[in-house]
Curated annotation (Swiss-Prot):
It catalyses: urea = cyanamide + H2O. Its EC number is 4.2.1.69. This is Cyanamide hydratase. Homohexamer.
Length: 244
C-alpha cells in the first residue's frame, strides 16, 4: 500500500471521538458559504457514475437523496475540521462511500440477511466496487468506512474516511453530536439551505427512524442498537426540521 493510497483513500488514523479531534485543534477553520454548484461531485469518474446508477436503481428516493446530501455535508465538514486530510482525500473515494453507505437498507438486501445493514452493506459495497473496476485498496477503504459508520464512541481510532462518514451522516440524521455544542453550525445556514434544496429531504428523519425501528425489531442484535434511541434522536432533529 503506497503512502499516496493511504491519503487518497482516507486510511489515516484519527480518534473515533470527533470531540477529541476538536479538543486537540482548539478551533475549527473559518466557516464559508457554499452552494451545491461550488462543490464538485466527481460524476465524470466512470466508476462513480456506475456506482451512482447502481444505488439509484436500488435505494429509495429518500435514501438516495440522503446519500447525496452526505457527500456535501462531509466535504464542507472535512475542510473545516481536518483540511490537510481533506485536501489529500480522493473525491471519488468519498463519493463512493457516500453513495454506498446505506446500500444495506435496499429492499433487495434489508431482509435477505440476518447481518446488520451497515456490516452487510460494507461487504456488498466492496463486492460491487471490485466488479465495477475499483482498486482493491479503494474498495476496502470504502467497505471499512461503511462497516464502521455507526461505530460512534469515545475510545480508539478510526480511518479519516470512517470518521467523515460518521460525521456527515450524523449531521444529516440527528443534527447534533454529543459533547460538541456547536456541531449544527459547522455548516452555515446558506450552505445548509442549498444542499437541502438540491436534494429534498421528503421527511427523511421520520422515514429513516421507521427503517431503524424495523431493523431493530427484526434483528435485535443489530449494530444500530449501538446508538441509543437512534430513531428518537432523528425524530428530534431540530436542525433539519425546516426542510423536512
Amino acid at each position: 500500500m503506497s503512502s499516496s493510497e493511504v491519503k487518497a483513500n482516507g486510511w489515516t488514523a484519527v480518534p473515533v471521538s470527533a470531540k477529541a479531534i476538536v479538543d486537540s485543534l482548539g478551533k475549527l477553520g473559518d466557516v464559508s458559504s457554499y452552494s451545491v454548484e461550488d462543490i464538485a461531485f466527481p460524476a465524470a469518474d466512470k466508476l462513480v457514475a456506475e456506482a451512482q446508477a447502481f444505488v439509484k436503481a436500488r435505494l429509495s428516493p429518500e435514501t438516495y437523496n440522503h446519500s447525496m446530501r452526505v457527500f456535501y455535508w462531509g466535504t464542507v465538514i472535512a475542510r473545516r475540521l481536518l483540511p490537510e486530510q481533506a485536501k489529500d482525500l480522493s473525491p471519488s473515494t468519498w463519493a463512493l462511500t457516500c453513495l454506498l453507505h446505506d446500500v444495506g437498507t435496499a429492499e433487495a438486501y434489508f431482509t435477505s440477511t440476518r447481518m446488520s445493514f451497515d456490516i452487510y452493506g460494507g461487504i456488498k459495497a466492496m463486492e460491487v466496487l471490485k466488479v465495477l473496476g475499483s482498486s482493491t485498496d479503494q474498495a476496502e477503504a470504502v467497505a471499512e468506512a461503511i462497516i464502521r459508520h455507526e461505530d460512534v464512541g469515545v475510545d480508539g481510532n478510526i480511518t479519516f474516511l470512517g470518521q467523515l462518514i460518521q460525521l456527515a451522516t450524523l449531521y444529516d440524521n440527528v443534527g447534533a453530536y454529543d459533547g460538541i455544542d456547536d456541531f449544527g453550525s459547522w455548516v452555515d445556514d446558506t450552505t445548509r439551505n442549498s444542499i437541502n434544496t438540491a436534494f429534498p429531504r421528503h421527511g427523511w428523519c421520520s422515514w429513516f427512524a421507521c427503517t431503524v425501528r424495523k431493523e431493530e425489531s427484526n434483528k435485535p442484535w443489530c449494530h444500530t442498537t449501538h446508538i441509543p434511541q437512534f430513531d428518537k434522536q432523528m425524530e428530534a432533529n431540530t436542525l433539519m426540521k425546516p426542510w423536512e
